Amino acid sequence: MMNIILIGARGAGKSKVSRSLSKQSEIPVVSTDSVAVYETGGIPIPKFVENNGWKAFRELEYSILQKLQNANGIILDCGGGILFDLDESGNEVLSERKLDLLRKIGRIVYLERGIEELVEKVKGDKTRPDLSKITTYRSILEKRLPVYQEAAHFKLNLTKLSKEEAAEKILDWIGIKSKSI
């Protein structure tokens, strides 16, 4: 069975859509962020990043994807930065190695929302670590959104869709019958 990989910005709705997809398809969800917390012995991601930095977190994501490359029949709910690594200067760059693994693992679905909508959704959310002390989330999004688009096999704008409708569209695209009808 094919794996479904959900990518998109922080706040796009990947976790909600993945749960709805799972409910409709009976395919289990694996969250890269949940696995990361598990792998660090329960340390929340903001704390891990604070203690170890983003570069270490991006390495952790890569090791998680390596472990999942032979997975079969999962919905992979990816953290917003899954497609990125940091260069020597600490700038975000496309992670070819992670993208290659994601493409090996399954079909990539980009869950898209507008920048304004995303900025509003994550404002003041303390469960999410700061992406940068200097750069605004808006400018990070401006760089990331085209990368998500390029990486995806399928793009779905969630602005006017419920999580259930989004899940149905993804299942239709993949050719899996919804079990909840």
From Swiss-Prot:
Listed GO biological process terms: amino acid biosynthetic process; aromatic amino acid family biosynthetic process; chorismate biosynthetic process
GO cellular component, one term: cytosol
Cofactor(s) listed: Mg(2+)
Record organism: Leptospira biflexa serovar Patoc (strain Patoc 1 / ATCC 23582 / Paris)
Keyword Signal: no
Family that this chain belongs to: Belongs to the shikimate kinase family.
Subcellular location: Cytoplasm
Record-linked PANTHER family: SHIKIMATE KINASE, SHIKIMATE KINASE 1, CHLOROPLASTIC
Pfam families found in the cross-reference section: SKI (PF01202)
Record-given protein name: Shikimate kinase
